[in-house]
Amino acid sequence: MADRLRTLAALLGTRWRRFGSREALERHQRRRLRAVLERARRVFPYYAAVASDDLAAFPVLDKASWLAGFDRLNDHGLTLDECLDAARAAEQRRSFDAEVAGLSVGLSSGTSGRQGVFLTAPAERARWAGVMLAKALPSLTEPARVALVLRSGGPLYDSVDGGRISFRYVDLALPPDAIAQRLRDFAPTILAAPPQVLDDLVARSPRLAPAVVYSIADVLDDEVAVRVEAGFGVPVRQLYQATEGFLGISCAHGTLHLNEDLVHVEREVIDEVSGRFTPVITDLYRRSQAIIRYRLGDVLLPGPADCPCGSVLATVARIEGRADDVLRFTATAGGEQPLFADFVRAVVLGAPVVEDFRLVQRPDQSLRLAVRPQRAQASAHLALQGLLRAKGLVVPEIIGMPWPVEAPTAKRRRVRREG
């Protein structure tokens, strides 16, 4: 009963809380930051030596440093190894019920290397459920059947189920036909799945008719969005959720907004011209685990300052992938220059006959390219060479490679940089 009340309180509080200006939002953030940072210095040994409650006094952590300090960044002193052991055992059983010291333990996909580990207490799960419902449901009065296709489920998602909301987790590890059948049987009104799954379902399950469709857990490419929208007859929205928090969601106008009411976002700009940045986030509500000045590995392209929905929350034009996968080339004028994955995707997928591709950059800047269908290899090569020349970059060796073996639960990485 207590958890349901927490969920209801979070739902109502989030749904009806409106910020009339950026100033009002920033006042809310400052209040929450004061509470979070003051508690962090008291509760988490990692921050015991931090001299003040000023956010700038706290170090910026990436995944490696955060995992290295894991036992000092959770309020139970749990070690990384014991949490990993519990979570991996649960994943092998496909049960996703791992728990250590009363905290649920979940794993990230490990796209950027080592898997992240997240801990949630029952009260945090209840609050997350309320916030998610408030932001994702088009109506609070109409019944909803919510289907989520993901690599892993667990208490964090199960906490949504009940009452007027029916929830169904579908295991991404299932064969595509089985996923489609389970969704047909459930007939969701709201469907959330990785973009490649949505793309497959359009062809495989024409009888599915969700009223709302969310792309989750991977980069939504333009050509996939067009096919999915045409297939389901509704716009594809995005839900930006990571191990580190509920980071953003599309509004009714299709604009992706950062959840700045839940997380404080600092921007590490990586391209001055476009404003592309890597977010450094501080969770304003999490308690079991410290997410303070955590550098995400994503590259975000800022959106317009204003949105027709009237929200003052910052907008994102596109989530472009991992910062680690920004390609690096020698410029013809000298020096090194980045090439963002979004440009590569657009050019290669726009080449004649190309349906899909995988591109890997080696430490020596050479490229390995796999293309579907195989007969499109030459046109993909030419398109890639043309892009590099147009950007004023030295064209390295480009070699064809076999299509890589990919687990069905793995995130799709079309563009990847090694080393």
Could you describe each region identified by the protein language model?
Residues 119-120, 158-160, 203, 291-293:
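A short secondary-structure junction signal
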Residues 1-31, 35-38, 165-419:
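Active-site glycine/GP-rich loop and adjacent strand/helix microenvironment
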Residues 108-112, 162-164, 209:
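Acidic/polar active-site rim loop that often engages polyanionic ligands
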Residues 1-107, 113-127, 133-138, 152, ...:
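Nucleotide 5′-phosphate-binding alpha/beta core
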Residues 116-117, 126-128, 153-159, 200-201, ...:
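Short, well-ordered, mixed-charge alpha-helical segments that flank or form enzyme active sites
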